[in-house]
Amino acid sequence: MPKTETYPRLLADIGGTNARFGLEVAPRQIECVEVLRCEDFESLSDAVRFYLSKCKESLKLHPIYGSFAVATPIMGDFVQMTNNHWTFSIETTRQCLNLKKLLVINDFVAQAYAISAMQENDLAQIGGIKCEINAPKAILGPGTGLGVSTLIQNSDGSLKVLPGEGGHVSFAPFDDLEILVWQYARSKFNHVSAERFLSGSGLVLIYEALSKRKGLEKVAKLSKAELTPQIISERALNGDYPICRLTLDTFCSMLGTLAADVALTLGARGGVYLCGGIIPRFIDYFKTSPFRARFETKGRMGAFLASIPVHVVMKKTPGLDGAGIALENYLLHDRI
């Protein structure tokens, strides 16, 4: 089939809260981007059909190729989302949507593919020197959950992406304050993973733990209705609520620890890339937050980490971009 006949391609980036859809009408050209709330639809197929009906006027041809990035491990045909109610069969969904091929990949595999094609203005660098060519790149990011993957670019330019579930590693507190936060979480959960703190709901959990800290009983606190990640972040930045600022500082410190752990584990001299929608909302604060200092606080390996740049991904739809690149790679090489 001529390459032009594979367009438009149906792309999706499906997280725990939102599903983003787009149509790739030409290489790296994505149109008709829509964001739908997962809770508004009984199933993935229902959401896709609704999306396609909204884009009906833009569709000259029905898509026959699709690529969906989903926030869950892919272990066969049956897919169960980690942080929402959707479950689906890849093959049944392909047939239901009249697609010739439906590629389904982990969302942070898509993020890794997207990073392979990013320009300098798509990224905000936080410390470090420069990336080492062909060295592993670590990709992680807090959102509804916490995703982790690895990107390796070989000397011939080919890409290898290693998916993982690093967000579910056990969290290790760094200091007495984080021990207090961990103990609060441990009273609620049998397993306290990094994702428990480094996610949208994690901001709320950190706030709740800190609000019970001795000496903070009389500090101004949020009402129950205000206890959301967005409001905690806003109050932290405007300076009205010191406990919110402490919450955000603690969040960034914890993220620095995890990012350093991942970088050391992978030998990520190619850089660390932070994805997701949370950090770009407060990027100016993040540049001077405790993140970078904590990232480099690794004893004998501090100098090793000091040279590694951390990049915050500022691009709006990297998940869709990566889903498109993964599909292109599949169609060219019949592999990803």
From Swiss-Prot:
Per the UniProt entry, what is one GO biological process? glycolytic process
Q: Which InterPro entries match?
A: ATPase_NBD, Bacterial_glucokinase, Glucokinase
Q: Which reaction does it catalyse?
A: D-glucose + ATP = D-glucose 6-phosphate + ADP + H(+)
Q: Where are the transmembrane segments?
A: none
Q: What is its EC number?
A: 2.7.1.2
Q: Which Gene3D superfamilies match?
A: 3.30.420.40, 3.40.367.20
The record's subcellular location field reads:
Cytoplasm
List all disulphide bridges recorded for this chain.
none
Which keywords describe this protein according to UniProt? ATP-binding, Cytoplasm, Glycolysis, Kinase, Nucleotide-binding, Transferase
Cite the Pfam families for this sequence: Glucokinase (PF02685)
* Residues given in the record as ATP binding sites: A12, D13, I14, G15, G16, T17
Cellular compartments per GO CC? cytosol
* Any one GO molecular function term: glucokinase activity
Q: Which coarse location class applies to the principal site listed for this UniProt protein?
A: cytoplasm
Regarding protein family, the annotation reads: Belongs to the bacterial glucokinase family.
Protein name stated in the entry: Glucokinase
